């Protein structure tokens, strides 16, 4: 449902800054803005910028640069005016209040993006990518969101939809002319459904990798008690995140810290020291440590250079592992021939941490996105709907093999198209739209 009113909001985050932006969109955006600006906004051409003074009730608010983008050549598809004023809280707030006093309505979270979607400027997948771009915490999450916003995900979904529509058209012909001998034509919809299934499966298979790239690679620090795992976590992140004492078994639970290394996100996981114990609480912590090791993508096995070398757990041989010798400022570690990279550090002095960061960086850059157009799913909503599409296509393919009635096959394909419609936004409900855009910031 298209909106008829004019909305306004501050588009920049609160606080000190060189520039703040107030955005207005809607049928009366130009006339409302014109009433508070010293220049003649109504006479300005689209996509031009003009310097002037914002005045309301004969009071000068601020000098501002005004940008005009006329319908339909704007982000929302409506007339848009943006006021670029001095940063800080008061100038932009007073400009917004003036716009509201002249008839604009305060925008809801994500309402500008929602209008762009409703006016056909972007689809729902691209709209969701805007929030992902804003909230990206590392360079991979940014590239994934950028690819989605540029339409690469939408193109893949559109390909699936086109193949299903072609298959459905063949099936409807078969249903309309059952007396005709066109059995050989049944291979055509099977081919289209198979192609659609292949693309769908590729997208579904990208979900775990997309989640890892967007959320960060999980690296667990594990080892015997008092080896210095918590000290290493604190040293790497440069935070006093974990409690450090000389008492073995201080860490009883999993402690996770996000850390960005050269644009890549790591989830560093500190864990309880692994040993035999009768303490019930410590036992639970050790079990969680083992679970963290099994679920992590890499292990930093921390050893005390001054202590005897214990037997290594089997899981170290099954995952990317670095053998991290700590406390090398007070003891020399033994010479071992093991299939792991060995790094010698001191959490106390900082020795060896440059080499450790280089090794971790090498791990992280095994997947390079850069300007690649590869599509990764990261949204649970997208994954759920595509899984429904996959189920419907699989059922349709099975139905062909079992010679089910064409009406049953057509029903499966229509259900698949319905899920795709929910994905792209062509059939989405207002409740779903409200839930999606409510997560956006105001002014976007």
Swiss-Prot record:
Residue ranges of domain TrmE-type G in the record: 216-365
GO CC annotations on file: cytosol
Cofactor dependency: K(+)
PANTHER family for the chain: TRNA MODIFICATION GTPASE GTPBP3 (PTHR42714), TRNA MODIFICATION GTPASE GTPBP3, MITOCHONDRIAL (PTHR42714:SF2)
Pfam families: MMR_HSR1 (PF01926), MnmE_helical (PF12631), TrmE_N (PF10396)
Binding site for GTP: 226-231, 245-251, 270-273
Binding site for Mg(2+): 230, 251
Subcellular location per the Swiss-Prot or TrEMBL entry: Cytoplasm
Keyword tRNA processing: yes
Keyword terms of this UniProt record: Cytoplasm, GTP-binding, Hydrolase, Magnesium, Metal-binding, Nucleotide-binding, Potassium, tRNA processing
InterPro entries on file: G_TrmE, GTP-bd, GTP-bd_TrmE_N, GTPase_MnmE, MnmE_dom2, MnmE_helical, P-loop_NTPase, Small_GTP-bd
Chain residues that bind K(+): 226, 245, 247, 250
Subunit structure as annotated in this protein's UniProt entry: Homodimer. Heterotetramer of two MnmE and two MnmG subunits.
Name of the protein in its database record: tRNA modification GTPase MnmE
PROSITE patterns: G_TRME
Family named by the database record: Belongs to the TRAFAC class TrmE-Era-EngA-EngB-Septin-like GTPase superfamily. TrmE GTPase family.
GO biological process, one term: tRNA methylation
Function: Exhibits a very high intrinsic GTPase hydrolysis rate. Involved in the addition of a carboxymethylaminomethyl (cmnm) group at the wobble position (U34) of certain tRNAs, forming tRNA-cmnm(5)s(2)U34.
HAMAP family listed in its UniProt record: GTPase_MnmE
